[in-house]
Design a protein with these regions (language model features):
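Accessory DNA-engaging acidic/polar modules
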Residues: 3, 13-16, 33, 47, ...
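Short, mixed-charge low-complexity intrinsically disordered segments
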Residues: 39-74
Length: 74
């Protein structure tokens, strides 16, 4: 069970009080949400850092199973 919780943790991008959901199709705009449950998540640190850098956001660790959110520290 503990291993399942660890694998459920993903990196998400937060900018201000909003979380990145994704890019709007056929547009160069991005969709944002106030809920981390809506956020795009990845376990690929390099990809997450690239997206956060491009959008001016910060990386956060998010575990939707446990409902835990905390700032990512390299």
């Amino acid at each position: 069970m503990n291993n399942y919780l660890r694998k459920a943790t993903v990196l998400i991008v937060k900018r201000g009080a909003e979380y990145l959901v994704g890019r709007i199709p056929y547009s160069m705009e991005f969709r944002w949400s106030t809920s981390p449950y809506d956020a795009w998540g990845t376990r690929d640190r390099e990809k997450a850092e690239a997206v956060a850098g491009k959008l001016g956001g910060d990386l956060w660790l998010w575990n939707p199973v446990a409902g835990q959110l905390r700032e990512y520290a390299n």
